[in-house]
Structure formats: C-alpha cells, structure tokens
C-alpha cells in the first residue's frame, strides 16, 4: 500500500494541546489512535504527537504536514495529544501523569522555539469541547494541573 502524502503546512501559527478522552487504565498510543481515526474515515492519525501515560512521546502525522485535530486551524497548526483525560465514568478529568506533563512541557518548549511566533492553544479555545480536560494557560504559567470547566 502506498504511503499517504499530506499537504505540507505553509506556516505554523499555533500549537494545540488535546486529550485522547480515554480512561487512565487505557494506555494507548499512536497505533491505537491511528486505528480509531481511520475507522472514522480519516487517512491517518490526526495528531502530530501523542504523549503516552509513561511520558513517551510518539510521532503521529508527519510534523510538517497539515494535521486533522482542530477544525479551521489544521492548515497552520500542530496537534499534540495527551493520552487520558476522562475518569472511569466518562467525565473529563485532568488525570494525566507527572511524566506526561513533564514530556508535554519539554515538547512545547521545543516546538514554540522551533516555530517562532506560534502560540499555545487548547482545543477548547476554538471548539465547544472540554478537551484537553485541563486549564492549559494556568498549567503553562503556574504549573498547576486543574481540570477544565470548559466544554
């Protein structure tokens, strides 16, 4: 099967943080998320990076390609997905591990430096969702992980 060729992103103006909306017991990664996205009719995984429960950062869609993670913003942004984000009852919860949050901070520092002028955004900043399940601005500025009340 031929590898899918995606359009290259002309500019990178934002880095979006998402969650997979999975329970803490579900230690999924790029392979599973790719399968879910393909089952929805997508050509590949929509995120550029996935951060597993143990903090491992996995590459998803090619970093330079247009993603499929934030409608209306895919053409000029990168998508980073944290595995987790809901509790056992399906309610949004900032249940990410310290290893995930450390990896997220490191990755975001790298991406923001690489794509100078880009801004950090949560999926819920541009869509009526609770994703990524926490207050990104508060975490980024104060290192406080608080479940999001947006959605």
Curated annotation (Swiss-Prot):
UniProt entry tagged with the keyword Metal-binding: yes
Annotated protein name in UniProt: Endolysin
Activity regulation comment: Binding to the viral RNA polymerase inhibits amidase activity.
Reaction catalysis annotation: Hydrolyzes the link between N-acetylmuramoyl residues and L-amino acid residues in certain cell-wall glycopeptides
Entry's family note: Belongs to the N-acetylmuramoyl-L-alanine amidase 2 family.
Cofactor note: Zn(2+) is required for amidase activity.
Function per UniProt: Plays an important role in the switch between viral transcription and genome replication. Once produced in sufficient amount, interacts with and inhibits the viral RNA polymerase that becomes unable to produce additional late transcripts. This lysozyme-polymerase complex in turn plays an active role in viral genome replication and packaging.
GO BP terms in the entry: defense response to bacterium; negative regulation of viral transcription; peptidoglycan catabolic process; viral release from host cell by cytolysis
Site annotation Essential for amidase activity and zinc hydrate coordination: residues: 47
Compartments (UniProt record): Host cytoplasm
Predominant location category: host cell
Superkingdom, natural source: Viruses
Subunit record text: Interacts with the viral RNA polymerase.
Enzyme Commission (EC) number: 3.5.1.28
Domain N-acetylmuramoyl-L-alanine amidase: 11-132
Cofactor list: Zn(2+)
GO molecular function: N-acetylmuramoyl-L-alanine amidase activity; zinc ion binding
């Amino acid at each position: 099967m031929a590898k899918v060729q995606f359009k290259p992103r002309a500019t990178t103006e934002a880095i979006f943080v998402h969650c997979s909306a999975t329970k803490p017991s579900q230690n999924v990664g790029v392979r599973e998320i790719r399968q879910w996205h393909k089952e929805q009719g997508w050509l590949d995984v929509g995120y550029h990076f996935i951060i597993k429960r143990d903090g491992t950062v996995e590459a998803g869609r090619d970093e330079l390609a247009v993603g499929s993670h934030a409608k209306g913003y895919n053409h000029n942004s990168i998508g980073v997905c944290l595995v987790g984000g809901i509790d056992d009852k399906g309610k949004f919860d900032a249940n990410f591990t310290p290893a995930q949050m450390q990896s997220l901070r490191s990755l975001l520092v790298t991406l923001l430096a690489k794509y100078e002028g880009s801004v950090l955004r949560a999926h819920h900043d541009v869509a009526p969702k609770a994703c990524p399940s926490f207050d990104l601005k508060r975490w980024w500025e104060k290192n406080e992980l608080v479940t999001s009340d947006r959605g």
